[in-house]
């Protein structure tokens, strides 16, 4: 997805959130704040973007958004239980209506047989208690994996929670 397409998607998300009087927060690891950056590229995004958390280290995940050390130790940072706790923690800390969390292995190193480079977990949560998780495996270099993860996060937020609702 091009920068222009990411911006267009972010504008769609923003318009839908603004129409609802709702806000979103992000908790990002492998994307390093890219989702928050794309969101804040839109003029007026302060009306619907509460804040973003870049929780690259396990310590940051625990300190900033309350991911339990036991969860990190048992499942690893790139796992469904961790992204769920990231989304819930960000939602609570920001008092937002929607949360998006992302943790993955962008490469070129760090992959394993169980979690190859390109593996990314996503969680989406709402203040109403709804939530979904997804695991994707993207291809390409580090930049490509991170760009695809950013696009996927925005597309899923739009399609699953904001479009036609």
Swiss-Prot record:
The highest taxon in the source lineage is: Bacteria
S-S bonds:
none
Name the catalysed reactions: beta-nicotinamide D-ribonucleotide + H2O = nicotinate beta-D-ribonucleotide + NH4(+)
Q: Which SUPFAM superfamilies match?
A: CinA-like
Q: Which GO terms describe its biological process?
A: pyridine nucleotide biosynthetic process
Keywords annotated in UniProt: Hydrolase, Pyridine nucleotide biosynthesis
The UniProt entry, under InterPro entries, shows: CinA-like_C, CinA_C
GO: which molecular function terms?
A: nicotinamide-nucleotide amidase activity
Please tell me whether the keyword Phosphoprotein is annotated for this protein: no
Q: What is its EC number?
A: 3.5.1.42
Q: What class does this enzyme belong to in the EC scheme?
A: hydrolase
According to the record's subunit comment, the protein's assembly and interactions are: Homodimer.
> What's the stated role of this polypeptide?
Has NMN aminohydrolase activity, not active on other substrates.
Write the protein's name: Nicotinamide-nucleotide amidohydrolase PncC
Q: Which organism is it from?
A: Shigella flexneri
